[in-house]
Amino acid sequence: MNVNEIINKCAEKNIQLWVKDGKLHFKSPQGAFGDELKQEVKANKEKIIELLTHKEVNIVQNNIEEEYIEFPVTDIQASYLLGRNPGYLYGGLGCKIYAEFLTEFTDENKFRFAVKKLVERQGMLRARFSKEGKQAILPEISKLPIEIYHLENETENDINREILQKRNQIQFKQYNPEKDIMFDLVLFIINRKKSVLCLSLDMLIGDYISIDVLMNDLEQIYSNQQIVPLKINYRDYITYTQHQREDINFLNKFYEDKAYWKNKIDLLPGKPEIYTSVDFTDTESKTFFQKKYTLNISKWEKFEEKCRKYHITPTAMMLLLYCLTLKQWSKNKDFLINITVMQRPNIHDDIQKIIGDFTSTTLFEFKESDSNSIKEQATQTQKILFDNLTHNAFSGIEVLRELKRKDKESIIPYVFTSTVGSGNKENILQKRQLLYKISETPQVLIDCQVSKTIDGVLVNWDVREGVFPRGLIDEMFESFTEYIHNSVFDEFWENKLMINLGSNTRKIRKKINDTEKLYENKNLIESFFLRCRKNPDRTVLICGEEKFSYSKLENIAATIQTRLLENGIKKGDKVGVLLEKGGWQIASVIAILSLGAVYVPIDASQPKERIYQIVNQANIELNIYQKKEERITEKDIRIDLHDISSKNGLKYECFDSDVSAYCIFTSGSTGIPKGVEMTHAAAMNTIMDICSKFEVSDDDKILGISNLYFDLSVFDIFAAFYANATLILPLESRKKDVSHWYELCTKYHITVYNMVPAQMEMFMAYLQVNDCRKNVPRLILLSGDWIPANLIKNIRTRFPKTQCVGLGGATEAGIWSIYFPTDKMSETDRNVPYGIPLSNQRFYILDENDNPCADYVIGEICIAGKSLAKGYMNDPELTNNKFQYIGQINERIYRTGDLGLYREDGIIEFVGRKDTQVKVNGYRVELGEIENALRKYKKNRKCSCSEK
């Protein structure tokens, strides 16, 4: 190793070297000074002493002889060059700024001369860049990048149109670093005293402060003011920084800062996970748009006053408000922000007068806080920011490289840039009137910029076009500016942040949840008895070849009811139903409900142990069964399908619609099924609304392929009674046979399909090879699982005139609670959206603190309204856990465990599950129940289930 390498190695190991009284001294952490390095130091001791003793103080010096020799780019410049490559995420463009100023450049010749002298003075205006990561200053350029337009005789409208046209041409102009002059000046002379100057500048050649330098120089030269020649140039500064990195003091600081960041690296979060448009690809969007907000001088002074009171810098406070806004829309609440650092070291009097890129970056980790107030969060923010800036010898770019080495997220596209308090006595925007500005940066999605202006302080977001859904940024920026507005009040600082949804969002949510509709107060079987009196001979049910009129079904129900009464069944009792599909199954349900009792449908094919669990959990009095082996308890009733022997008519107990009607058991995560106890009123609210919305009537024939223990059957049965429609059931032996469905549809001209998507996909596949002209339904209801867009396309192709509706919700909320007509789908929808609430039902998407989520923020879907279940039968703990009153929204809600988000139009999108629940053909299956069942066997004591 040479001497510099030895010194570098010592610094890396935090070994300090110094000379005192002509002798070399060192201080080393324990174990850092290994034998090999000691030998190197010992062998080169005299040279090290000489270097440390006689090394000149590193000062920036002008090297006129090497002015045009190429020199290295900075880390920031290298990242800008890399970002121009469209192969990188969010790349494909340069970093540049476009600005328009109101100026007094009204003499064309003087302006051309001023620009010529400006280009001669500032070497970086003549810079070129190579593919190898080098830059060089050209001795001269052949043509000045100037355009001048005389608009003295134009109207104001014409002037504005001309300027806008030019703005659209050059504000996002992309320069070729290897060939182009990297800036443009366009001057519009309006009259003898006023002009508008448009500046387009690639920030490879100059940072934000460089615009100030450019305008100052231009104004001085134009005004014939004495302008002192520069004693150094940008190349001299880069040479200085290269030498600086070899200095022992810098090396000690560099490795100290590197250790600081490496100690944090494993704890650093990723970028904010804010929803992006599903149709966005990183190569499509090459432009930015801007949202801006100006604090006038009075407001800014009040803002500064509050910051001083709480000992917080304005920059730290603005950063916190920006992060709090991002947090509200981010899936992850801990994230990284890129901070732009204005870094012009005080090493020469001319350092503030040079055009060039002096910026650096650092990272800021925002973490969700348990703080009780904004002031505590602001203090924490300021401390982290100060600590990170103090360790900036190891730059943000270098930290990102370390993250990449560890296969962690290394593109942080959310940026914060503040020139408030940057050290400049004056800022460009404070001295001249800015009419318009916008910047663009590769691999950046939102750049929050804070800068002083002639009017106060400008806060703007430069946002990459096409990345976010329309309206999202408007809502975010509205909340951000409201936080700024509120920060001039002590109450804001002294309390926790109150989540603020934008006014438009609040308006849309209120409208979407305004679902109140007056329906009759009916129970589930009231309509059945009405039809029995009015239309006793009308066919209400067909199963296979067997038809059931209202009177026939009533007689069968009366036979079953007699047996129930003989066994002491009364109002409120729970009765299990284990019958196969058919008239006797439906009649059993009618018989049970007529007594005010509760029917509990049970799958007779499931393991006996699970049936026992259901019987015990529901406190079932007796079960109605058909096959001898299905008997569960001594009191159970076996049905003879050929015995319609009751001499008594079907009794109908009058009861309130708020009493329980049925209890459907779903999979439980503890291994024990949970029974959802539903009232007549809750189920009827959904049934009446679906029949009303989609005009289900006595002309309809409903295909009822769902099992009784699946809540879609509740609609099939009782919608038929309510609407006087006909219910068509498949034979039990062929209920899963698609060809049997086809036969039924062909024979009976079924008009309403009520299926889960998997069933519909099977049916559509069958129809592709069979004539479906006689099987054209009027209405298709799909629910129970994701509904793929391709399925809807197939349905539209096969049945172009059929109304198809996606439905969703939970067994705990009365069959369905939400709907979406599929004819309203967009081309970009990969699945049918969840939709909007049904009548008298309301939806909320809540975060972990039960606050409403902003648009496109994933949270838990919660349902409120008239269709909510009573709870889980005989399980008050689970009921209290899942059915809760939420003060923030003043509602009793059911926590579905489903994850979703609101679009900006109020439509809800289903995203997935919070837990391990999965859907199998529409049925809810808790993986925990499967695991608990497996663990009962010795070989499976340690097992886990996952969805594949």
How does the language model describe each region?
Residues E66, L218-F288, E365, E376, ...:
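Non-catalytic, low-complexity flexible loops and terminal extensions
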Residues G83-G92, Y255-I312, N500-T505, V540:
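Flexible, P/S/T/G-rich "lid" or insertion loops adjacent to the active sites of thioester-utilizing
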Residues K425, I508-R509, N623-E653, A683, ...:
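AMP-dependent adenylate-forming
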